[in-house]
Design a protein with these regions (language model features):
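Peripheral, non-AAA+ core regions of ATP-driven protein-machinery
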Residues: 1-192
């Protein structure tokens, strides 16, 4: 399991910092997450121009351990959107999946191993790419009994399943309070 953390400074200069010994593919996934957030900002009560001006810092803890691969795309996006909206990430959900520029979720490798890691961490729900649904036969029966696997095909489904927004009347108020906050941070979202 790999937690992802995001901090945003609204009165910044548009700088983006990505840390935690991330390889090129994972850094590209972070860039995709940022583009997705900017494009879809209005759907979440956010101003895309405000996001452009923010300093963003994305971090994967345990910096001494090199990390790479596209599987963290959904998690990077979830952590970023949590930070920007102020909506917490459900703590009983893990996720995995590569993302595209248009918000599609693509299959990953190692579903069996990633599922076992989620099981060991006590996760109750795991979001997997729809394209990996046929790979569930590889997952141990004990793990399948303990975890609800939710196949997803796009980031909209991921964010609906992972973020806990306030009541609809609070949506824009919450986003505005974030914008006025000198620095906001996301709770960690977990990727397998």
């Amino acid at each position: 399991m790999l937690p992802i953390e995001v901090v945003a400074v609204p009165q910044g200069e548009g700088k983006i910092q990505i840390t935690g010994s991330l390889g090129d593919v994972m850094k590209e996934s972070a860039q995709l997450a940022i583009t997705y957030a900017r494009v879809h900002a209005p759907e979440y009560g956010l101003d895309p121009n405000s996001i452009k001006k923010m300093d963003l810092h994305i971090h994967a803890p345990e910096g001494a351990v090199p990390k790479d691969g596209p599987s963290a795309g959904v998690t990077l996006t979830t952590a970023l959107m949590s930070c920007l909206t102020g909506w917490p990430v459900r703590c009983d959900v893990a996720m995995t999946g590569e993302i595209t520029l248009h918000g599609n979720v693509l299959p990953i490798g190692g579903l069996k191993e990633k599922s076992m890691a989620a099981y060991r961490e006590g996760m109750k729900t795991v979001l997997i790419p729809k394209g990996n649904e046929s790979d569930l036969y590889e997952v141990d029966e004990e793990v399948k009994k303990a975890i609800q696997f939710v196949p997803v095909s796009d980031l909209e489904q991921v964010l609906k399943a992972t973020l806990e927004p306030p009541a609809k009347t609070e949506k824009n108020k919450n986003a505005q309070s974030f914008i006025s906050n000198p620095a906001a941070e996301s709770p960690a979202a977990a990727v397998m």
